[in-house]
């Protein structure tokens, strides 16, 4: 089972399949997956943030403990992407890839925010003015919960995810 959630200005990422969750190799894998998708649309690479990863870990733990799957209502300054799926069934690349699948919808409409639930993960993933990311993966009995935090946040209504300029 795979679940995704998005709200402006939020979007996020983490992996369980290959590298041990939250290890240095896992961090490198999820960062590489982000940056590969960003390169495809000409966005500059992201840099890993331990602070964002710590914030993501705290919220991922809260979601895993509660079984809830909603964006953090107390987070107003960071972009956020959420992912939830069957425990140990998906790699970091597959998790990020699920957000990247929204590219077709985002490319179809210049007013991407009109369909944020269909495009918001992808647009945060590639948002050109976002510079840092931190992700964390937490598991409960049945699911992996991935939270990725971004700064500065993307999904700014009226701006292009590719240039930071108004459309």
Predicted segments — roles?
Residues 35, 57-61, 83, 96-100, ...:
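Non-transmembrane alpha-helical segments in soluble domains
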Residues 89-167:
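Disulfide-stabilized extracellular recognition modules
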Residues 22-79:
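Short, well-ordered surface patches within globular domains
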Residues 44-46, 50, 67-69, 80-82, ...:
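Flexible, active-site-adjacent loop/turn segments at secondary-structure boundaries
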Residues 12-24:
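Bacterial Sec-dependent signal peptides at the C-terminal "C-region" and cleavage site
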Residues 75-96:
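A solvent-exposed, acidic/Ser-Thr-rich amphipathic alpha-helical stretch
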